[in-house]
């Protein structure tokens, strides 16, 4: 089942570090089953509060493949520039739909 990596940039503190990340990150995808769907394209914040400076969505073949990329030596060496240059919210989301309402967000149920 596919998995989606979503990065939301919430603020930039050092653009030079971020530009280094942008330059050095694409080769880290080599050898991984990944498709970049969107990166830093125009967006609209429809709900909630920002700040949102930019959004990235990538599709991996599985959660395991995404974690393998995230922990790969190539990406570990590069991601330090992203972390130094900006504040991001990073999410890894399992693809698919939870059909049963009872199974959606079980952590939010009140305990009786």
Predicted segment positions?
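C-terminal structural segments of small proteins and small subunits
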Residues: 76-91
């Amino acid at each position: 089942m596919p998995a989606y990596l979503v990065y939301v940039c919430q603020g930039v503190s050092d653009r030079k570090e971020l530009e280094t990340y942008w330059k050095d990150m694409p080769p880290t995808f080599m050898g991984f089953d990944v498709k970049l769907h969107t990166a830093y394209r125009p967006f609209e914040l429809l709900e909630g509060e920002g700040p949102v400076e930019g959004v990235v969505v990538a599709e991996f073949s599985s959660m395991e493949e995404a974690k393998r990329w995230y922990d790969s030596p190539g990406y570990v060496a590069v991601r330090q520039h992203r972390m130094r240059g900006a504040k991001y919210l990073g999410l890894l989301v399992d693809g698919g739909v939870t059909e049963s309402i009872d199974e959606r967000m079980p952590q939010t149920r009140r305990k009786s």
